[in-house]
């Protein structure tokens, strides 16, 4: 429990606290945290991840209101089903539980998605690059989903 809390919440919060003062002093900065779909839609049987990810997102939302007048924005970008090495690793574990190979589990998940494909790291990176730039100075306190339309609602 303690290690998980440290990894998911306390370490990111400490990093933000160490860097945001410099951003405020420069009257410009961007804090962009990586979230997950669980921020808005808890995943079954994943209580700790759901709780900690939502907690970090709410911390970011609160901080956003405190630092926006100093030229600092704070956002969370939450990917779902982006094809990475981690996605491949979890497919191997989940597939094995179902008697499937990693490739079969990946294909099953891909076909089940609304987009009919996994997101690419570039899909995620494009949003992060925009939020980090000068044209996103009024965009703060949000949880941005990169999910191929998989969200059950508008949030």
Positions of PLM-derived features:
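Catalytic Tyr-X3-Lys loop
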Residues: 1-14, 32, 49, 56
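Conserved catalytic-site loops of classical short-chain dehydrogenases/reductases
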Residues: 2, 29-34, 72-75
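A short, exposed helix-loop element centered on a Lys and neighboring polar residues
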Residues: 16-17, 61
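Catalytic loop of short-chain dehydrogenase/reductase
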Residues: 24, 30-56, 60-69, 81-82
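Short, flexible catalytic-loop segment of classical short-chain dehydrogenase/reductase
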Residues: 40, 74, 79-89, 93-95
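Short C-terminal tail/terminal secondary-structure segment
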Residues: 41, 129, 140-155
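Short, small/polar-rich loop/turn modules that mediate ligand/substrate recognition or access, typified
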Residues: 68, 73, 139-141
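A conserved structural motif in NAD(P)-dependent oxidoreductases
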Residues: 101, 113-124
């Amino acid at each position: 429990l303690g290690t998980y809390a440290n990894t998911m919440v306390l370490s990111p919060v400490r990093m933000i606290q160490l860097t945001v003062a410099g951003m405020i002093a420069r009257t410009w900065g961007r804090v962009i945290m990586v979230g997950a779909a669980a921020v808005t839609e808890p995943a079954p049987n994943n209580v700790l991840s759901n709780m900690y990810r939502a907690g970090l997102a709410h911390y970011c939302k609160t901080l956003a209101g405190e630092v926006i007048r100093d030229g600092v924005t704070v956002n969370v970008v939450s990917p779902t089903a982006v094809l990475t090495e981690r996605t491949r690793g979890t497919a191997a574990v989940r597939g094995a539980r179902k008697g499937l190979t990693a490739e079969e589990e990946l294909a099953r998940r891909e076909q089940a998605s609304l987009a009919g494909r996994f997101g690419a790291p570039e899909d995620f990176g494009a949003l992060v690059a925009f939020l980090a730039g000068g044209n996103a100075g009024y965009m703060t306190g949000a949880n941005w989903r990169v999910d191929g339309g998989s969200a059950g609602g508008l949030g």
